[in-house]
Amino acid sequence: MIEQVSIYLTSMVLGIMLFFSFVIAPVVFTTLDEDNARKFIRRIFPYYYNVNLGICLIVLLTFIFLSKLGIDFYLILAISLLFAVSNYLLMPLINKYRDESQDKKFKYSHFISVVINFVQMIFLALLLI
C-alpha cells in the first residue's frame, strides 16, 4: 500500500512537470503581455518548485520507511535536491539577470533550469518504469 502511494506521488510530480512545461508556460507567454507574463511566472514558479519538492520529500520518507534505499532512493533524492537548487539558487539568479538586462547570463541560467527540469523528468520516468 505505501509503495503504491509512492508510485502515485512520483507519477503526480511527473504529471505536474509535464503540464507546467507543455501547457502552462507556453499559454502564459502567448496569452499575457510580456510584463504580466513575467509577473505571473515569478509568482507561480516558487509554488511549482515547493509543491514538487514537498511531494518528493514524502516519497523519500516512504522509501526510508520501506528500507528501499537503492537506486530509486537516490534518484528521488537527486530530483529533490534539484528542485531545491532551482528554487533557492537558480531562480533568484535568473530573476536578477533579467532585471539587470544581463541577457547572456539570463539565457544561460534559464537554459540550465530547462536542462535541470528535463533531467528531473527523465529521472522520474526511470523511477516509474
Task: Name these PLM-found stretches.
Residues 1-129:
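Polytopic transmembrane helical bundles with strong interfacial aromatic enrichment
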